[in-house]
Amino acid sequence: MKTIRIFLVLISFCAFAKAQNAPTTSSVDHLAFELGIGEHQQINAVEVTFLEVMEDSRCPKDVDCVWAGRAKVKVRIEEKGLNPVEKEVVFDASGKDNILHISDDLVIKAVRLSPYPETSTAKNNRVYYLELQV
């Protein structure tokens, strides 16, 4: 009986050890940065400008809401040799990727709009920052 227990423990150990995934490493390091309203950043041949916050109806941190709300911002993407493009980016509860630009060697995503609303801060006193990831 003792032999069977030891055998089962060894089999279980082997099964769990085999199920472990080897850590993956990425050859690309992600760069994250913030832009204030009116600020721009050059990334390779692409310039991103944070133009405005069009809407911020996100539910404040310290309140229970029926609807999570959303934030909508406008950005301008200028790529060398092409006409500038203005895009609206929506941050909502879906958590979907907000990809601003894709090329062969570059993906630019809008990750977050800060600060997240609080009832203690008046809406017109907020200094917004758009966090981007490359």
Where do the model's predicted regions map?
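Surface-exposed, beta-sheet-biased, low-hydrophobicity segments with strongly acidic/polar composition
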Residues: 20-134
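Bacterial Sec-dependent N-terminal signal peptides
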Residues: 1-23
